[in-house]
């Protein structure tokens, strides 16, 4: 009987050690909606890099969705080793829960944003509605597809880009911008929860005349549906800076801090920057950016800091409960 008990104890210990080892070698990246293709290729490259560096194998798990929803999932217990989200406010929200150091943005270069993007338009082939700039989105008879700013990071970039366009026009101010964005959302027939869902609504389901899209998502749609859609680059747009960080409490518990740190640092490596550029994210590395310069349209860009005073201020004013978006978006009206 003693041998049976000892054998059972040993077996339980082996199972526990096996589970711990598996946890240490499997990294969960919780990301925003349209990064699937980017991280599929990047992860494969990092697996080779890590094997060469450490002699150890590593596997990845993925979770993709609207950036705000993803942040909430991590706060509620999704065991992300790293988060690669659409905007800094969503990581700040996780930090407020105690899972991430509040000074997270200082840990990596460029405010922990290894690549940038912007917002462009995707229109039907031949641009039958003649959409050229933000002002065309409020015309009668133009249906605009954009995700829900309450759940999607990309949608918040869309909203803020439209707001600042209106504010910078002749005679523009916050009141005029509010009128403009309110008119724009009256032309939105449906709000998907994330950017990929909005792309599916526009490209696959054929709803709408114009999609407000991440630049990389627009180019991916062109690659897959070049006979159905075209890209229109507006006169002005926002510099979107998707940030990344390690989830401190999770990596401490799982023992994955070294791997998670190396994973995010590798995004800044020449190979990581090349992969980002190949997937139409604007690289930070100047040499890689110069190599891929012809991939990206020249567009006047403004930052959220200069236009809105940063994400905390923008979130409080526009996207918090009873904020400007809640005031202007009236479905069915």
Segments from the language model and where they lie:
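A bilobed periplasmic-binding-protein/Venus flytrap-type ligand-binding module shared by bacterial periplasmic
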Residues: 119-127, 241-258, 275-279
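N-terminal segment of the mature folded domain
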Residues: 24-152, 330
